[in-house]
Amino acid sequence: MHTWALLLAAGQSSRIAAACPGVRKQFLLWQNAPLFWHSAVMLSRVSRMRGIIFVFPEDMLEEATAMVRELDAGRALGIPWKAVSGGARRQDSVASGLGQLPAECDTVLVHDAARPFASASLTNSILDALQAGAEGVVPALAVTDTIKVVEDGAVLSTPDRTKLVAVQTPQGFSLQALLGAHRHCAEKALAVTDDASMLELLGQHTVITVEGEASNIKVTHPEDLTMLHSSEKKNMQVPCVGWGYDVHRFGSDGRPMKLGGVPIAGGPGVIAHSDGDVLLHALTDAVLGCMGLGDIGMLFPDTDAAYDNADSAVMLNEVLEKARNAGLLITHVDLTIITQIPRITPWRDQIHKNICRITRLDASSVNLKATTEEKLGFTGEKKGIKAVAAVTALRRVSS
């Protein structure tokens, strides 16, 4: 499955204009970043997301693209992105974004930039449903209010609310199904308010629901701004530091050496249950430390045969996914390899680049050092290798 997201930020914000004159809601600053950026960061932290298409107002495309470029430089998304101009209607903006997807894309998420509270967990549940074969997936919440059908101020009927749900974004689709639905609506001149409606009108695909999130509101009315400010107070981010340490012995019957996910040709064998990547093990422990989740041995015990020669990068990615779902924002990683052999210098740049790729941090946010213990201790006697890691992060806490 090759998934991209369309982030719709092309609206005119007519219903909220009086509360924020001169600024469209998708560009309102919240937690020191425009509203649309929070959704972009969330989407980029979902491991199965391959890229994002930003859809901006045509008259702001150049300015908004420069904004994304600057934001990405400071807090890297870590995945490819493009920016395109939208249209007069929501479906026109979606069509514009669909036209920019790469050839290998086969599934797409469509998300409103005005929903900054959608979580990575919700996004993953949508992707899980798509991976299981669904062609259209929408997050939905049961309707708790009684709904009336009204015409000219007069109540015509009261639908059975047990059959009603309120749908949200992101909405997920098979790309071919969504393209076909868009063509159908264009040919029939049909106007819709969401993409799932297009599949319903085409009548060839089933749209299923997953449980939505009550917190995933859409900023639409002036009073919603109050909720934004309230959320900012309730969901504060506090700095935290995680520390990791790992050691492995050398042995002629050990596994081929890997450091930071990079094979070290000619390095001594490493005795380990998994692949023995001491650097990734230390980093994994440090990330777990930021979340208060113990250590790598608790999550991936060496008594479990499933982790025999397990790829440490896969284990680290699983922990990073937990961190993203928990709202942990990793800002800096500092790593030290301590060993007499092999010399790390020939491999340093490759290791550094790979750590940046895995953590989705820019080069200035990952520091890698190597040192010896001046021939003292077990590393100095060339009996083993150790690594330490310090991770700095922002953790979301509720006041």
Curated annotation (Swiss-Prot):
The enzyme's E.C. designation: 2.7.7.60, 4.6.1.12
Gene Ontology biological process terms in this record: isopentenyl diphosphate biosynthetic process, methylerythritol 4-phosphate pathway; terpenoid biosynthetic process
Record has Chloroplast as a keyword: no
Keyword Transferase listed: yes
UniProt-annotated stretches for the region 2-C-methyl-D-erythritol 2,4-cyclodiphosphate synthase: 240-399
HAMAP family reported in the protein's UniProt record: IspDF, IspF
Protein name per its UniProtKB record: Bifunctional enzyme IspD/IspF
Species classification: Bacteria, Pseudomonadati, Thermodesulfobacteriota, Desulfovibrionia, Desulfovibrionales
Gene designation: ispDF
